[in-house]
Amino acid sequence: MAAAAVDSAMEVVPALAEEAAPEVAGLSCLVNLPGEVLEYILCCGSLTAADIGRVSSTCRRLRELCQSSGKVWKEQFRVRWPSLMKHYSPTDYVNWLEEYKVRQKAGLEARKIVASFSKRFFSEHVPCNGFSDIENLEGPEIFFEDELVCILNMEGRKALTWKYYAKKILYYLRQQKILNNLKAFLQQPDDYESYLEGAVYIDQYCNPLSDISLKDIQAQIDSIVELVCKTLRGINSRHPSLAFKAGESSMIMEIELQSQVLDAMNYVLYDQLKFKGNRMDYYNALNLYMHQVLIRRTGIPISMSLLYLTIARQLGVPLEPVNFPSHFLLRWCQGAEGATLDIFDYIYIDAFGKGKQLTVKECEYLIGQHVTAALYGVVNVKKVLQRMVGNLLSLGKREGIDQSYQLLRDSLDLYLAMYPDQVQLLLLQARLYFHLGIWPEKSFCLVLKVLDILQHIQTLDPGQHGAVGYLVQHTLEHIERKKEEVGVEVKLRSDEKHRDVCYSIGLIMKHKRYGYNCVIYGWDPTCMMGHEWIRNMNVHSLPHGHHQPFYNVLVEDGSCRYAAQENLEYNVEPQEISHPDVGRYFSEFTGTHYIPNAELEIRYPEDLEFVYETVQNIYSAKKENIDE
């Protein structure tokens, strides 16, 4: 509506601007004010875009003040979408009225698509072609992203379904952009050694919703460099590194001067700023994200080494990365320039161990084994990133509690972007798609996504015929099942076969045995799992066995579980359930329960009334007891 009002107002500007202004009551007094005062009034923040459109149609002078490239429309744009202003240079010529219209249109289109996702993808993960509507929209991508961010920032407990799908779309858009940037980065010549830039791309890809930029991370590192320079000045006030300007890449050749830099670095990083290797929580993905390393001041050998190397190089010390087994190191050359060097001409630096300087023998003691000379060699950017992503991949294989395997999916994407012909990882990716049910909307797209991966594997390694054949068979079976699927199953509480169901979707529950908090998002009159699951979960040991209602619940730890009715009870102190899929099923949290979204309510049309009765009986009674 706002966009229509703006368009409507601006369409009449040329015709009305030629008419005499004094006919309008009080207008003559207004237009006689100095231009700066009028501009200040029009930019006061109380006027909407539609107001400005109407004002500019009253007379020529006000129209000129509201010119499309002027301050008035710039202020309208800034007030409405402040986060976008960083994308404009003060020296750029911008038609702010046109920008306003394009941004408004992009927002309306983005909301239309977000609103459609729940109905289209409620029963499955968003497929590979599910984002094509966004990709095909006309207009700057930053406008669509900004609208998605606006949706995510809506009032905390409402619009949960919109936020759920807006988050997925934003996640996808940013990851696609970051992956393209990473691929372009990997095409740089071998002598392009921006290790930090590559590490930031990995960080961004795994955390696409976070505000992470190379510029911001570099600024934080620059502030550390300033502290090192301050300490270095106390060691040697004439040190050449102190004269370096930002962005310079000069190197100092004297070993003694390099040593002074490293001493100052060790003091600032480990004594003053308290950076340290994270021995207590080593297997945490946060240790590999550079923005988290700077925030938490801890990491693992490879991330600590990249930070150390970046600072050292900015101060003129040419350290090099060493892909040492089990413990990433840096090496510092002690030999003369131009001489033939071997591994004993280097000192090896353990950034994880507070910058400790090691000999070759001490490096072997560090990992408890003898290694060949080749493992002391320097590695390029791609190999460093391969090791970082390999670490994330290992962590991703361990994690699965939220059943989305997001870290595993992200690290697989990154690894295959660098090494697209890794057969075992391609097989793992195909299995992951199959396991998660991330099926495309149409069978032809599924063939392009899953079967294409399998065909590529077969070409690379014919020996994988058995594994590929198994996955192809199951993929084709899935296509056939999708063709045979019937409509939505509706469960009515009033149905006689559901008479034993005591709880309803949206209620906050507590598990009697394990104590976890959860919200119900589905139920069955009896256990619908297979015999193997029933046996493994020891369901027969329950007093009512599998002949009782079972509930699908989202648990606060991020897992999804299937709980027997006798194991659940009302949570007398209901709280929000921080599960990533809450928005998939619910539109709002009221403080006592969740309200199902339209798609879930279609499947359980009588549950909401029962929820209201339960809330009234359980929580209102509790409040009355407290008041008494």
UniProtKB/Swiss-Prot annotation:
Keywords assigned: Ubl conjugation pathway
MF terms (GO), sorted A to Z: DNA binding; ubiquitin-protein transferase activity
Any one annotated GO CC term: cytosol
Ranges that cross the membrane: none
SUPFAM superfamilies: F-box domain, YccV-like
Top-rank taxon: Eukaryota
Domain F-box: residue ranges: 28-84
Gene Ontology biological process: apoptotic process; cytokine-mediated signaling pathway; ERK1 and ERK2 cascade; hematopoietic stem cell differentiation; hematopoietic stem cell homeostasis; ubiquitin-dependent protein catabolic process
Assembly with partners or alone: Directly interacts with SKP1 and CUL1.
Matching PANTHER family: F-BOX ONLY PROTEIN 21 (PTHR31350:SF21), SI:DKEY-261L7.2 (PTHR31350)
Biological role: Substrate-recognition component of the SCF (SKP1-CUL1-F-box protein)-type E3 ubiquitin ligase complex.
Protein name, per record: F-box only protein 21
